[in-house]
Amino acid sequence: MKPMYRSRSWRRKYVRTPGGRTVIHFERRKPKVAHCAMCGRPLNGVPRGRPSELRKLPKTKKRPERPYPNLCPSCMRKVMKAQVRASITA
C-alpha cells in the first residue's frame, strides 16, 4: 500500500474481482452536505460530490432553481419579506 493511501482521507472500497480475489480500491471521500448560509440547516436539492463530479452535471442539477439558492426555503422567505418591507417604508 502506498503511504499516501494509509491516511483515512481516502475511502476504502472492497471490490471482488472476476477472478474471485477481493481488492481494495481507494477513492476520495464525499464532501459534507451543503448548509444554509443563515441557519445552518442542510440544503435539499444540492448534490454531495467532489468538484470534478459536479462539473459534469448541468447547472440546474447543481443548485435549486429559485432566488437565494444558498439559503433554505424558510430563510429565503424571511429575507424576501425583509426586502419588501424595507422597500415599502423607504
Swiss-Prot record:
Cofactor: how bound: Binds 1 Zn(2+) per subunit.
Cofactor(s) the protein requires to work: Zn(2+)
Binding site for Zn(2+): 36, 39, 72, 75
InterPro entries for the chain: Ribosomal_eL34 (IPR008195), Ribosomal_eL34_C_sf (IPR038562), Ribosomal_eL34_CS (IPR018065), Ribosomal_L34e_arc-type (IPR047868)
Keywords: Metal-binding, Ribonucleoprotein, Ribosomal protein, Zinc
Region Disordered, residue ranges: 41-72
Gene Ontology molecular functions: metal ion binding; structural constituent of ribosome
Pfam families: Ribosomal_L34e
Any GO CC annotation of this UniProt entry: ribonucleoprotein complex
One GO term (biological process): translation
Stored PROSITE patterns: RIBOSOMAL_L34E
UniProt similarity note: Belongs to the eukaryotic ribosomal protein eL34 family.
NCBIfam families with a match to the protein in the record: PRK04059.1 (NF003143)
Subunit composition and interactions: Part of the 50S ribosomal subunit.
Protein name: Large ribosomal subunit protein eL34
